[in-house]
Amino acid sequence: MAENSDLTSLEESFRKFAIYGDTKATGQEMTGKNWAKLCKDCKVIDGKSVTGTDVDIVFSKVKGKSARVITCEEFKKALEELSGKRFKGKSKEEAYEAICKLVVGKEPVSAGITKPAATGAVDRLTDTSKYTGSHKERFDESGKGKGKGGRETIVENTGYVSSYKLAGTYDAKVKK
């Protein structure tokens, strides 16, 4: 079986892939989508002996009947299941070691994510610190929008009479 340090780094890889793409994930359970991503990114899926379908079948085998996710222990069982198929000529232990080496230390790859373009006119139009006039009042120093408070002056209609506005200012006017 794998060494103790390999197991901890294997669990670390599990956690990284488990939280990928889900802001509410704790890292204790992995979805089928993230399991497939792990297998693809770590080159467990080679297209010949192990395909995406094989990965999905193994996921369904190791998870509970009504469960939609797998735990770290089930993840290790799933790797064991795939290791025999991925490395056919090796013994079970050697195949499991080899598949663990593929996964250990890997992180999810974010391919195809576009970066914002900050060139010429786009930079001037999107930089809120360069805004002038009433538009600069719409944003705070960090560039975050103020919402309706930045567009309109909000007056509270409070007081004894419906048309009396700006409650609490009468005393300031009388003292003059």
Swiss-Prot record:
GO terms for cellular component: cytoplasm; microtubule. Residues 126-152 are annotated as: Disordered. It is found in: Cytoplasm; Cytoplasm, Cytoskeleton. It comes from the Eukaryota. GO terms for biological process: microtubule bundle formation; microtubule polymerization. One of its GO terms (molecular function) is tubulin binding. Keywords: Cytoplasm, Cytoskeleton, Microtubule. It holds the Pfam family p25-alpha. Residues 134-152 have a biased composition (Basic and acidic residues). Belongs to the TPPP family. Regulator of microtubule dynamic that has microtubule bundling activity. This is Tubulin polymerization-promoting protein family member 3.
